[in-house]
Swiss-Prot record:
Taxonomic classification: Bacteria, Bacillati, Bacillota, Bacilli, Bacillales
Biological process (GO), any one: sporulation resulting in formation of a cellular spore
Pfam families: Tlp
Main localisation: other
Family: Belongs to the Tlp family.
InterPro entries reported for this sequence: SASP_thioredoxin-like
Localisation: Spore core
Record key words, sorted: Sporulation
Protein name: Small, acid-soluble spore protein Tlp
NAD keyword on record: no
Lineage top rank: taxon: Bacteria
Induction and repression of expression: Expressed only in the forespore compartment of sporulating cells.
Length: 65
């Protein structure tokens, strides 16, 4: 028998994911300041994707609330 689909804490888990992504974004931003141009470009591209993820996660949180 499959496990029941318990989504009662989805919003909380999503919020935690948002915070972790923000933390990673900030750490990467600090690292980029000390990196060479090639690495800095890669970090900036990844941070752009992180911003998109944060927007998506926040939208999901709204849907869950």
């Amino acid at each position: 028998m499959p496990n029941p689909d318990n989504r009662s804490d989805n919003a909380e888990k999503l919020q935690e994911m948002v915070q972790n992504t923000i933390d990673n974004f900030n750490e990467a931003k600090e690292t980029a300041e000390l990196s060479n141009e090639k690495d800095r470009s890669a970090i900036e591209a990844k941070n752009q994707r992180r911003l998109e993820s944060i927007d998506s996660l926040k939208s999901e949180i709204k849907d869950e609330s």
